[in-house]
A protein has these predicted regions:
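Conserved binding/recognition cores within well-folded domains
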Residues: 2-94, 98
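Short, charged, intrinsically disordered terminal tails
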Residues: 110-111
């Protein structure tokens, strides 16, 4: 989405162009918010970029995924396992990363057939 600065319209670089070169073309597993940064979990490793989670999720059209927590977005095909216990769920990704599922998003994921 364009932003205004000094009367000029500036376009932000899309998420795919913000990725470090070594991660371009990698399968995106998850996005984790860390303060003002996002940690991208991919098939080629992880890296941080400066971007808001909501903006990044808005640019993921065509990739099936969902928020699992206020600070996590997960690609459905990246999930290797789901554990549930004590009223909580944890998603384990292909790379071994464990993603907490909040109660708020748990209902939505269950309704969508994720577990």
């Amino acid at each position: 989405m364009p932003t205004m600065r000094g009367g000029l319209r500036l376009r932000r670089r899309p998420l795919r162009l913000r990725l470090p070169l070594r991660l371009r073309g990698a399968e995106l597993y998850a996005i984790e918010a860390e303060d003002h940064y996002l940690r991208l979990h991919t098939s080629r490793g992880q890296d941080l970029i400066l971007m808001r989670l909501g903006d990044a999720v808005g640019e993921l059209e065509g990739l099936e995924g969902a928020q699992a927590h206020r600070s996590w977005w997960v690609a459905r095909r990246a999930i290797a396992d789901v554990r549930r216990g004590d009223g909580r769920a944890v998603l384990t990704l292909k790379d071994g990363t464990e993603v907490p599922v909040s109660r708020t998003y748990s209902r939505q994921l269950r309704a969508a057939g994720w577990y």
